[in-house]
């Protein structure tokens, strides 16, 4: 979450970040550490060779 705030992708993180599936995932071997993730987003990340860690 701190990385997203530092990159000015989000303004503030109080309760963590939830990743939702919307659009096309072009990154490969992406590792994501988030509070929540939708099933579709998790499947897309894993299909692209990445991994998801839920806090």
From Swiss-Prot:
Q: Which GO terms describe its cellular component?
A: ribonucleoprotein complex; ribosome
Q: Which Pfam families match?
A: Ribosomal_L27A
- Care to name a GO molecular-function term for this sequence? rRNA binding
**Keywords assigned:** Ribonucleoprotein, Ribosomal protein, RNA-binding, rRNA-binding
Q: Which GO terms describe its biological process?
A: translation
PROSITE patterns, alphabetized: RIBOSOMAL_L15
What InterPro entries does this protein map onto?
Ribosomal_uL15/eL18, Ribosomal_uL15/eL18_sf, Ribosomal_uL15_CS
In which family does this protein belong, per the annotation?
Answer: Belongs to the universal ribosomal protein uL15 family.
Q: Please give the function described in this protein's UniProt entry.
A: Binds to the 23S rRNA.
**Quaternary structure and partners:** Part of the 50S ribosomal subunit.
By what name is this protein known?
A: Large ribosomal subunit protein uL15
Q: What is the lineage of its organism?
A: Bacteria, Bacillati, Bacillota, Bacilli, Lactobacillales
